[in-house]
Amino acid sequence: MRLDRFTSKFQIAISDAQSLALGRDHQYIEPVHLMVALLDQNGSPIRPLLTMLDVDVTHLRSKLGEMLDRLPKVSGIGGDVQLSSSMGTLFNLCDKVAQKRQDSYISSEVFLLAALEDRGPLGQLLKEVGLTEQKVSQAIEKIRGGQKVNDPNAEELRQALEKFTIDLTERAEQGKLDPVIGRDDEIRRTIQVLQRRTKNNPVIIGEPGVGKTAIVEGLAQRIVNNEVPEGLRGRRVLSLDMGALVAGAKYRGEFEERLKSVLNELAKEEGNVILFIDELHTMVGAGKGEGSMDAGNMLKPALARGELHCVGATTLDEYRQYIEKDAALERRFQKVLVDEPTVEDTVAILRGLKERYELHHHVEITDPAIVAAASLSHRYISDRQLPDKAIDLIDEAASSIRLQIDSKPESLDKLERKIIQLKIEQQALSNEHDEASEKRLQALNDELNEKEREYAELEEVWNTEKAALSGTQHIKSELEQARMDMEFARRAGDLNRMSELQYGRIPELEKQLDLATQAEMQEMTLLRNKVTDNEIAEVLSKQTGIPVSKMLEAEKEKLLRMEDVLHNRVVGQSEAVAVVSNAIRRSRAGLSDPNRPIGSFLFLGPTGVGKTELCKTLASFMFDSEDAMVRIDMSEFMEKHSVARLVGAPPGYVGYEEGGYLTEAVRRKPYSVILLDEVEKAHPDVFNILLQVLDDGRLTDGQGRTVDFRNTVVIMTSNLGSSRIQENFATLDYQGIKSEVMDVVSKHFRPEFLNRVDEIVVFHPLGQEHIKSIASIQLERLAKRLEEKGYQLEVSDKALDLIAQVGFDPVYGARPLKRAIQQNVENPLAKSILAGEIVPDKKVQLIVTNDQILAHQ
């Protein structure tokens, strides 16, 4: 008997039978070994055949196990296992049956027929479980679909639809699909295209996350509920699993063979199956090698002849990139465009999905949370689509609440740690016998008893609250199951079961749920089980860094005192500080225009008066770190071609994939302070880019992505008109100086640019008293640096006056002060520390002697 006459699956089963006999110390491979190997085989071709014939496979497998146990064992055979004579007879019978059926190869199911013809114990057992030659022969015809076995891999390609597709209608019947709310027009249009005589293949196109797959799931649910035209009733919607189709296709032509078997089975179904191909663009080029066809080209004939009812889904970009390039494939599909739903539609979708998420997370989702998820995600997450981004917020907020319920509350956790700490101390003191230790031990025991009693009470409260929450969830699960049972009964036309559920079980469960919910509504001390708009805002703030959660009292207080905080570092510029503070307060109070940046300012003034320092202070105030500021030195953008660095290089240029300097920074941190330093030094074309940012709060980068600037503070600094400020500072008031400066500024910048800036702020030159305040601030920073090293610095008033006097320059502002502190304070201090004249842990005083500052200890 030639082994190459068997199919590959049958050959693997024979090898498995040999291993089985060897492992059980059997001298011969009997037919029962092969039958067990065929049943236990991964992707067994025998199992579906027996299931079709209503055979209890588990019972058959246990009977075969008993037969194996009765076979004689031979020890010391040394791995020499041979085919038994009955096995040889069966193989000859298999060959005879295969020839009778005109098969080129002997397949696994032929072995079943041969075993039934044989009079051995295996044949007897198969007859006992209800198999006959006629029944098996008919089942083989059905499974093969009238085809002969002319390929060693024929068994692997059988039942291709079961292996390589997922039945969406079956999942809809089982209630495993989420409800599809809205989208009626798109589903109706899809049905309309499917009803056509030719080109009845819709392709659903839309941005990622708008619900393309949900439309097909909605179609499957309508088919199950008989809410479709006569022509589509009873059809199955199968989703092609491209992963399963490609996985394990090692040899050339294997992928094509699998796809061909899927198409052949679909052709046999004669239009009763609608094939859904998610990510349709993956079919173009899939399986393409040198000179071979890709999957897209294999689909074309079936699509053209109408043998294949296909629904595709892909994004707009991928449709353009892959499908439109292949005009022959594109013309066989009919486009169904899916737009992003509105905020109102998203709220309706979320209300429909609410129960599923409540059941999964075992928490309650409130209606304000649903409205907040839709509106906040629409406003603050600009790079993704509704309803996907809103569903994500609901899901994550519910997950965070569930995490808090499942994990130990913070108060309990702290108590437990304290108790452990006290027990360790108790153990240490119990070994000491002096009077002080015994007194401490007595006090410790009292404290420990108190803490343990407190812990026990809190734990009881926690367990009670958890039990109350789990009770409602159990009822909700039962109610969901009862509703699904009622849906099954409605489809089956079982009126008795329907009335029993509708008027008995469901109202009873709803009543129980109401009672449990009322008990749950009592104020909980440790646990929260409701997702509110606050939780949604918290999740959004974590995702984007934008503070949208309700302000705590501390933050409100901080915002009201914002000017005082900024004045701690920025001296003498009250107008600028007031303008910036008001913009931030408007934003956090929710009053600013949602379609523009939080604020856009042009700071004008001479060098060293605090323009850049105010930006750093603002970033530090808003984000507790100066690093949160996106600082762009505009003197780097003096050439025309350097403008592309801000938004990214255009296609075809080096660096296209990297993105823009400004756009990438804002995409990563949508809530930030953007400082465009020395803006007048930039090329005029840069201001054309800024027009869109200042007016609409958006900018399109080199790759066509829209970047959202609506949550940024844009600050531009410039030295324009500083000479006019110096000339007129003594004679004119603030408004007079501002009009003089604007005269210079309007000649340099275009009107459309200046018109879009919220506020143009002119900074004053700094006077002697301002320099003294700044000197005090800078010496405080020096004192902090010295404190880290162990030195305590004290500055006398005379020393402070001298530093302010030396560092004062009306033209250069506060910058000379830094040099004055370096030369007059830091240099002598450094020498004294290195010489050992100043030692740590003692006060260091700065005093003035003969117009010189000396460090004295």
From Swiss-Prot:
UniProt keyword annotations, A-Z: ATP-binding, Chaperone, Coiled coil, Cytoplasm, Nucleotide-binding, Repeat, Stress response
Region (NBD1): 159-340
Chain positions covered by the region annotation Repeat 1: 6-71
Organism: Vibrio parahaemolyticus serotype O3:K6 (strain RIMD 2210633)
Region of interest called C-terminal, as start-end residue ranges on this chain: 766-857
Annotated ATP 2 binding sites: 605-612
UniProt remark on domains: The Clp repeat (R) domain probably functions as a substrate-discriminating domain, recruiting aggregated proteins to the ClpB hexamer and/or stabilizing bound proteins. The NBD2 domain is responsible for oligomerization, whereas the NBD1 domain stabilizes the hexamer probably in an ATP-dependent manner. The movement of the coiled-coil domain is essential for ClpB ability to rescue proteins from an aggregated state, probably by pulling apart large aggregated proteins, which are bound between the coiled-coils motifs of adjacent ClpB subunits in the functional hexamer.
Gene Ontology molecular function: any one: ATP binding
Superkingdom of the source species: Bacteria
Recorded coiled-coil stretches: 391-525
Cell compartment(s), UniProt: Cytoplasm
InterPro entries on file: AAA+_ATPase (IPR003593), ATPase_AAA_core (IPR003959), Chaperonin_ClpB (IPR017730), Clp_ATPase_C (IPR019489), Clp_N_dom_sf (IPR036628), Clp_R_dom (IPR004176), ClpA/B (IPR001270), ClpA/B_CS1 (IPR018368)
Family membership: Belongs to the ClpA/ClpB family.
UniProt-recorded name of the protein: Chaperone protein ClpB
General function of this protein: Part of a stress-induced multi-chaperone system, it is involved in the recovery of the cell from heat-induced damage, in cooperation with DnaK, DnaJ and GrpE. Acts before DnaK, in the processing of protein aggregates. Protein binding stimulates the ATPase activity; ATP hydrolysis unfolds the denatured protein aggregates, which probably helps expose new hydrophobic binding sites on the surface of ClpB-bound aggregates, contributing to the solubilization and refolding of denatured protein aggregates by DnaK.
